[in-house]
Amino acid sequence: IKGGMGARPNKDGINAVAAGISNTMNTPIEILELSFPVRIDYYEITPDSGGRGRYRGGCGSRRAWTIVDHNARAAVCLERTKSPPFGVCGGEAGARASIALKLADGSIRPLLTKGGFNAPAGSQILLEVPGAGGYGDASERDSQACARDLQDGYVSAEPD
């Protein structure tokens, strides 16, 4: 599952991209579901996760797994959960990472961002990886770029 790449002085950041040094891989959903008793409920770009700016920071992604038919033990190591990915030259910060466990009764329990946890059968793991910071003042963003962001689902509303 991938996070956003920061905006550059002349271009938006890249959405949901692998960082070469992050020791992560983007295992296809079909392989995960064939290899483990889990169901991937969604895997998508997280709207509004890229920092606003003249150039928008790349959006992060989010994924939900349902533990199908047994209790499971999982481990996580997330960064950017307390301090968001910063923007530069007046750009706004991207969204922070988070992880939570939705239990069968519908209650949601935030999880520690480093370490192991138990996930009972029928529970759902909710993971959001961070977006990235924007570059430059958001009031200088091209109006056509704002409209494309809305159309593409990278933002949920046009800026004020």
Give a label for each model feature.
Residues 1-159:
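Glycine/proline-enriched, intrinsically flexible loops and inter-domain linkers
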